[in-house]
Amino acid sequence: MDHLGYSGGISRVGIQHNRYSGQFSDRYSQYSESEYDPSETTHSESDSENHHHSNIPILEYPSFLSQSNDNVSNGPSNNTLSSSATSLGNNDGDEDLENVINNYLSFEKDVDILTERLGKTLSTLETEMIVGVLDSGVGVNEVISQLGDKDGTHLTGVTAWIEYYNKQLQDMKKYIEHIEGKNNKMEIVSRNQKLLYSELNNLIGLMTLSDNTISTLTAPQFNDTKGLKMAIEAAEDLKRALTTKLKSGMDNMMAVKDQRKVFETYKISFARKVAALVENIFKTTDKEIGKHVITTTSQTPGEEKFPDYLEYYDLLRKFKPLVNWLKEMDHEKLIPLIVSYIKAFRRIYESDIKLFFSTIQQSLEKESKDQNDFFSSSSSSKKSIDSLNNNTSTSTPSKNSSSSSSSSSGKDGIKKRKINRLFKYALSCLEIYIMTKQNFVMDFFLYQDPPRLAGQRNHHSNSSGGGSGSNKDGKDRKDKKSSKKDKKDKKDKKDKKDKKKKDPDSSSSPSLDNDKPIDSNSPKSPNNAVNGSLSSTEESSPPPPPPPPPKESPDAPLDLILSAMFNGVVPELINMVEKADQVNPFYLLTMLLETELYIDAHSRKDSHHSSYFVKILAEVQKSIKTLFNKFLEVQVDAIKSTQTSLKRCGVLPHFRNFHIFVKELQKYKSESDTGSSTLLIESSYKKIILELFNWLDGLVEKLPEDKKYKFISKLENHYFFYLKLQELNINCLTQHKDTSQSIFKENLEIYVNFLIDLKFKPLIEYYTKMDELLLTLPPSDIQFQQSHSKQQFKKIVEKFKTENIEKGLLKALGNVQKNITKDSQLILVIWERLEEVFIEKYEHFQDITSDCYNQTMPVSSDQIKGIFGTVYKKNPNKH
């Protein structure tokens, strides 16, 4: 910028405005006029261009660029290259090559210096040009216009110089970008080489096992703590070398493949040693625990709890990392270990279960068997119901009142419990026992309790409930009560048990191949060992459609192990359920409630749940519902089989006993309105009520149409039923209460009309016919009808004077007292309704008599009201 010749050309323009000329002359006075001669612009275009090129100031380039064109373009000097070429043929060519490279590096540094200097120069030029334009503003425009007018040729030269300089700058920019591109490529290559070097180091470290690790894998020492720790660490190193996922392509390297083949041989050998070690531990533990069981049983007889075996679990947990490694690295060798584990511990667990249940049976309180046949016609049943009725009439039933006297102390000091309380205690102990064993199996064999998928029903939800489906189940069971079939089932069950005792391992070591999930409905499942009395009830029913096969899970053996270990739990629990059914079927409801509380608790997806515990309780739940539905069917059959006369029958026994049945059931109902036990109770009410209504309708249909007992029996029984349901005030019975009230009112109207017709039928018929005539005739024409003339009117009213009306009401009252139960408030209800209907009719008769005959009835409606009151007071119920 210092050598540009602007000032000479600008000073000769002769600008009139001193302000702008002074600024420009001051700015460019530093340049000499000799550097730029405007007279030379008259030359030819080519000469002018060459002249400008010669007058453009030359920047100071680096030393290697200041040489001749040949030297700059060809890099190093000819002498250097020739000497280098000559020296390449000599023995010391390596040193000359090094000199060439050093020269190249020095030249590269000069390029960097040049690039930096050019950048600074360009920045200065751009800044000064922009500042000058902004400061000059209008003055610049005037100067340019004057320059264009007076000497445009000078600007042409300046423009050419600027274009040349721009071209040089563009070339320099391309050169700089070229250099930067090479530098970037070199940097990328360097970075990739570093990453490759790092990955190769990692691969070498991963594919290399130390000598100690190899010796441990080859000859592990499991007997001492240090050797076991070294074996676990060596197993982890081997696992990492075999399973770590390498970068793309590295796993296909021949060296990696060969090394992993060697590691596979280590894995196979080490897995075989681990499997043998764990199997020996299981066998040893089996013997030790067997001795422990014998010792503790002899020392603490009658102890109502399960042994914990914590010290043996702690011993086995030391080898847990090796078992977990074996499952992940060689799962095929784990399968025989699971079978060995089952064989080692199943016998011990079966012994624990039998001992526990036999021990708690000693604390069972003896109770007399009471089937509570509320609707049976036997004398013992009537006696039992009468006692219940007396108890409920003198005391208010409370929730779970049976628990107040559920336990007592016997002569031997053992705490006595009722069967339902004993069942609850057994469930609490079983939960702890099973959860402890399950947690150990899950931790030791690295299994997870499979969570239930969202939207899927639990595997226990298919058990028979107390809803509408239970009606069908009950009807199916009703046809299966023959004693021969029960005996046959019990015999078959006994044969199966004997066979199982002879060959305990034949059916108790199911295959674990392929980790197939366990089907609880399979005949081989140990949880299907239910009592013969239950299996016989479902023998002739068609099998339900098979459920869709569950998805296979790697954790399915967990259920298999637990099923094999605790195959005696379900039969023991069902045995307690059957004993409770024999003593008091209502105990089944409390058992069902307790069972479902555990099912709900273990159906939640948290850390403390057991799908297996839910499964075995679901079988118990199903058995409880089956037995209770069977009890209900006994009650239904008792109702159906009852044949009785409806003549002056009063309230039938079955209708009288229903509220007692309800009160007893309510004692065993849970406080919450949800749950299967509540649904079962409510469905029981519905089933019995519908059967009662159908049974009474069946008895009524057998009577002739003209029999008064058809409506009298319905009237009295449904009135009693309505009052009792109203007294119970149970929400689920509201609909049935309304139904009984409707039937009662319907038959009340029929009976009242029947009573009126006993003595007042002619009067009713006379005025009924008159109402029909009034539909077509005016009231004044009625007296001209032969059937309703004034003479006929006088005859009819003469028959129903005061004394005759009183006799008619006496006869009606006598009929009511004769057919309705003594001291029943229904008598007064009927009498009051009779009074309402009769007076309503009589007042209507008075109105049409006045309209048609212009006369009055001999007895007024007020007099009739007095007659009703007098008759009822003078004639109390005498029968």
Curated annotation (Swiss-Prot):
Belongs to the SEC3 family. Residues 541-551 have a biased composition (Pro residues). Residues 480-500 have a biased composition (Basic residues). Residues 77-91, 373-409 have a biased composition (Low complexity). The lineage of its organism: Eukaryota, Amoebozoa, Evosea, Eumycetozoa, Dictyostelia. Signal peptide: none annotated. One of its GO terms (cellular component) is Flemming body. It is found in: Midbody, Midbody ring. The exocyst complex is composed of sec3/exoc1, sec5/exoc2, sec6/exoc3, sec8/exoc4, sec10/exoc5, sec15/exoc6, exo70/exoc7 and exo84/exoc8. It comes from Dictyostelium discoideum (Social amoeba). It holds the Pfam family Sec3_CC. GO terms for biological process: exocytosis; Golgi to plasma membrane transport; protein transport. Keywords: Coiled coil, Exocytosis, Protein transport, Transport. Residues 64-76, 519-532 have a biased composition (Polar residues). One of its GO terms (molecular function) is phosphatidylinositol-4,5-bisphosphate binding. This is Exocyst complex component 1. InterPro entries: Sec3_C (IPR048628), Sec3_CC (IPR019160). Residues 165-187, 226-248 form a coiled coil. Residues 40-52 have a biased composition (Basic and acidic residues). Component of the exocyst complex involved in the docking of exocytic vesicles with fusion sites on the plasma membrane.
